[in-house]
Structures are given as structure tokens and as C-alpha cells.
Amino acid sequence: MCDDDVAALVVDNGSGMCKAGFAGDDAPRAVFPSIVGRPRHQGVMVGMGQKDSYVGDEAQSKRGILTLKYPIEHGIITNWDDMEKIWHHTFYNELRVAPEEHPILLTEAPLNPKANREKMTQIMFETFNSPAMYVAIQAVLSIYASGRTTGIVLDSGDGVSHTVPIYEGYALPHAILRLDLAGRDLIDYLMKILTERGYSFTTTAEREIVRDIKEKLCYVALDFEQEMATAAASTSLEKSYELPDGQVITIGNERFRCPEALFQPSFLGMESCGIHETVYNSIMKCDVDIRKDLYANTVLSGGTTMYPGIADRMQKEITALAPSTIKIKIIAPPERKYSVWIGGSILASLSTFQQMWISKQEYDESGPGIVHRKCF
């Protein structure tokens, strides 16, 4: 069934971006926004050979005349019709493959509802006729990508953050914590604090500019209060940014105030714990005998962990929370933006994994429930 000459497809569907490619590659071939757009009014797009929907970058570029929807909210698929469109676009337009010819590895959020896994399985076999498929937990793939099987992953993307303790390759569900604070909340916050400076960013197009400012200029301060004092006393932390229209804006303490919300969610008016405390709480829900292994293998994953300075700050904050004798190590691989996908690429190309796929035959015999017996 799974011959070596047929590469498996690896598709990591995030709330913000979809990453897709071939098992064995070291990076995804296609990375595009997880959005589906439909025309707001019939007949606006004259002579364009009007399509009833657009996906990804094309939807983004035509957003003026479309209604945009994100089918994945907080990491969980909520709109299956649109999700099917994204998968269709992934296979046929981005990767240009026939899904009925390749095993497909999909990723899922931690604590994904059972019904969702079944639905994913059903769509792969019934709509796309895949010969085989598998569903893996995102954080587990990230830890594989870091060359480990035990540790705790802080996976923070665009729509949601999770802390996932993993022991010998298995996620420990009772200790997984979810924090609904991630990249898109930080963009909202940066838009707000830039407005306080007198720059107005309100439209979706301007939101993309703010996303770019966030990705290029923001960083995490080691000591927030001290950094605020430095920013107030001198201009050493100021950076200028050129807007598409040529106007140049200056951004100062916003550079580190924006990601500080990860450590102090009260900045966003949220009552939840910061990411450092969430990691600690997650570890404390685990058996006392494995905690030392988790502290020593704390792996960062996802685009929202890409800020310069975040690993040092995590080290400092968790050291302050943990027992004083414990060794704490924060692992922040440079490719962590794509580590879920990379872990999937590694897993799907292992010879030992080939018997783990759910085959079409098994699906036909057992139905969608097979996913709970074979993917855990």
C-alpha cells in the first residue's frame, strides 16, 4: 500500500496559516493563510470568470470584494465546508498532487474533540479518496522535530496557545492547558497601542501592515520595568518603519509592550495566567517523578514564539517559579515556526511508522471510529 516511491503528504492546518508539503522534505512547500473568501455581491467581478470562493493568498489579495472566513478557530476546525475547500486548494493548487495517490498525515490541536478527528478521517477517505491517512497531535510533532520524545511543548500560533507535557512520545491529556491568547490577539493589541501614539490602523489591509511591524520589530524584554525606563529615558530602543505609502513611523516601547502581553495577559484585559505560569501549572499537573524531565526539556514551537528574547525571559520566569535545585532548559529551535510540519515530515518518513497508517481498507471495515484506535 505505502510504497517508498510515493511520498506521503504532510498538512499542518493552523488557525492562521496552512503548512503543506511532502514527507522527507526539510520545510513545507506551501504556506498560505487559512482563509476562504466568498464574493460579497453577485456580479461584482465582471468578466473574471467568477468563482464562488477563493482560498489563501488569492482570497487575501481580493479581500476588498470578498467576505473572509477563518474555518479554524483557536486551533479547532469549526467550518467543515470551508475546511474542505482549503484541503482541496492544498492538494490541487499548491502541491499539485492527486490525494488518492498519497498517504496523508494531518495534524490536530491538543484536546481536539473526538467527533472532529472522525470527521477529518471521513473527509480524507470519502471526499479525497486517500489510500491511507493519520492524525497526529501538533505539539507531539514539535517535540519529535527537536529530537526528543519527552518534554513539555509551549506551542503558540495565531489563534491559540497550548502547553503540552509529553512522555515517551505520548501527550498527557490531563495536564494539557489551553490559553486563548496568541498571534492575532497581539496584532490587535499592537494596533491599539499604535493608535495611542497617533497612528491609525483599522482596516484589514492596515492590519497586515501591523502584522509585519510585529514580526519585524517586536521583541521580548528580559526585565519589562527596566526596559520601560530605558525607553522613557532615551531613544536607543526606537526603530523607524516605512509604510507602503512612503510615510515613516517611529515605534518605541510598543516593540516590547506588544509581546509582553504573553507574560501579562492583563494587558489585554484577560484574567488568565501568562505563558510562563501556564507552562509551570502544566508541569505541576504531571506525576512528580517526570517533572524534572519536563523542566529540562521545555520546547518552544509556533510563530508566536519567534520573538527575540523570549527564551531567555522564559528561562528567567520559570526559574523563579520552580524549585531552586531544578535544572531548567528552554529549547528554542530556529525553525520553530514550522516545527509541527517538520515533525510530521520526520514521522511520516520513518520506516517504523509505515504500519501506523490507517488504510482505506481498515476505514471501509471499521468506519471513522478507527482513528481513535490507531492515532493516539
UniProtKB/Swiss-Prot annotation:
This is Actin, clone 211. Belongs to the actin family. Pfam families: Actin (PF00022). Its main location: cytoplasm. PROSITE patterns: ACTINS_1, ACTINS_2, ACTINS_ACT_LIKE. It catalyses: ATP + H2O = ADP + phosphate + H(+). One of its GO terms (molecular function) is ATP binding. It is found in: Cytoplasm, Cytoskeleton. The keyword ATP-binding applies. The modification Methionine sulfoxide is found at M45, M48. It comes from Artemia sp. (Brine shrimp). There are at least 4 actin isoforms expressed during artemia development. It comes from the Eukaryota. Keywords: Acetylation, ATP-binding, Cytoplasm, Cytoskeleton, Hydrolase, Nucleotide-binding, Oxidation. Residues 1-2 form a propeptide.
